[in-house]
Amino acid sequence: KKEYNKINFHFTSGFEAKYSKWIEGYRINVQGKGSYVKKANPSNTYKDFKSYMNMVFAYCGTLSLEKEMKLQSLDKMKIGDAFIKGGSPGHVVLIVDMAENDKGEKIFMLAQSYMPAQQTQILINPSDRNLGVWYSLKGKDVLITPEWDFSVKQLRTF
């Protein structure tokens, strides 16, 4: 889609890191709250995007991500949404797959990683071993994962 102006993240400091500025050759000075400095020629390659995302991984955390994402209701839950607990430490689990039956009942698969963006892991459901790596929130207010619990009110979307 090439909607580069929609790719932006807020650092924990509050600074808005815009990918559209990055591809114009601006880089981010993280001193204070942050500022843009023209340091490179305009470019939009995979290497540029990866460099931008490395900066995002370094200076964004669960506190800023929780504020940036919008609340999502369980009935509208979709792949790419996340349960997020902002803090230090905080944590995020990402919905990476989902299935829905004729009654509208959903099961979903979760993935997690740790900082700084380490290898991704698929989570086993500790509450219902029969579901394996699948989760269901039917009749529940709390999502229980192997290491973290999340309220259903902590579901967020971009």
PLM-predicted stretches and their roles:
Residues 1-78, 82-92, 96-97, 103-115:
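Acidic/His-rich structured neighborhood in mature extracellular/periplasmic domains
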Residues 107-158:
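Low-complexity, Gly/Ser/Thr/Pro-rich intrinsically disordered linker/tail segments
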